[in-house]
Amino acid sequence: MISRRISEVGERMDNRLSSMRILVVEDSPVVAEVLKEMLLDFGCEVVGPVGNMAVALELAQSERLDAAVIDLNIRGGKVYPVARLLGERGIPFLLASGYADWTMPPEWEGRPRLPKPFTAEALSGALEALLAPPVAS
């Protein structure tokens, strides 16, 4: 049932995300694997997943990325340095967390968030919103 639902969402997102390179920063092996599979089903190319701050910083600096999904807390602390680097490079990112406390620097208060646990539909909706072209006013 779950994999079928992921496939249905993946089919809907396939054209839009098929060439997107998404960095995954997640220190839980189970969550990282599920997230990776969801993104692959959407047609994304997954960079990572990584759960180490130093490696996450290296990939955020050196890889060609279209977006990122980053866990707010990983081994080594809060992911603020990774988020800051992605922001400096103009790479959009989702902050993911299973904690109720979303305390973060003011500059990221309005950032898109992905509460854990999440479904394939929630992830696809968040990515659609994150990667949507700006609406002219």
Task: Please place each PLM-identified region on the residue numbering.
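Acidic, metal-coordinating helix/loop segments flanking the phosphotransfer/catalytic sites
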Residues: 49-67
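Two-component/phosphorelay signaling modules centered on CheY-like receiver
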Residues: 29-48
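Non-catalytic signal-transmission and effector/linker regions of two-component phosphorelay proteins
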Residues: 1-21, 105, 119-137
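Short amphipathic alpha-helix used as the core "switch/output" element in two-component signaling
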Residues: 80-91
